[in-house]
Amino acid sequence: MSNNIPPIRYRRKITGMSAILLPLLSETEIDWSGLRDHVARTADAGLIPAVNMDTGYGNLISSRERLEVLRATQETVAGRPFIAGAFVGDSPDAPFDFDQYRQRIDEIQSFGGTPVIFQSYGLTHQPASQLIESYARIGEHAGSFYAFELGTMFAPFGAIYDLEIYEQLMRIPQCLGAKHSSLNRRLEWQRLQLRDATRPDFLVLTGNDLAIDMVMYGSDYLLGLSTFAPGEFARRDAMWEQGDSDFYELNDLLQYLGFLAFRAPVPAYKHNAAQFLKLRGWIQTSLTYPGSAQRPEADVAILEEILKRLDA
């Protein structure tokens, strides 16, 4: 596979999917009104809401909370599309648990969503042939799904697949696309080249919040960063499709926000998201789910300066 940079694809219509932050009223109480408002805000902007992802603490919330998020999302989108994380928690020595994945898929589909298959130790620790067989079983049961490559800077159970495995994943017809979260342009460019040669309708969904201009090269996106500013992301995407040079200035400002929020430790971006949404008056507190990484309060002043520039 060549490492050449793929060409820029001007005036392309971008598919945007935005992970939804789960807001809190207290350490033990979810802000359901704030969640519904943010799902509506995202869908109204023209982006596809993605719930129970990392941004929504999909690996931390209880099964009751997970189902309530799905119910609230279904009611809010009112027939519009949404996707949701299918997370199976396990341990490093656990076998692949198809039954747990099947249950998560059934839950999501019962509320009208399309599943995004989170990795797990049991899934990613398999030999390549068994790994692909597991995804094929998931596809046969789900009918349609999105895969998810997650770098270990986000979660210890994640894995970035080699290109041979990625090609086999693309050949599973029920797999509509895959989120790629390596934070590495070169690896994502390779996937775009492989996609173009193998299955042009397959969505390479960038999860690179440090390189949101990957959409210029043919990636679509499923980002946590867009939860900070779904309307601005939608406006940026429309500028690209229209050939509007203002795309670059807005993209630069959104990327500045991404560099701040997604610095190490990367999982603490969710605290920055809560701080930013509170500054916007969209949620009531900047609390995060118990067990989440935190940012210093000093970040708020920088976030406020970015918000003023976005609103200018």
Kindly give the residue locations of the regions a language model identified.
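Catalytic alpha/beta core domains of metabolic enzymes, predominantly
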Residues: 140-266
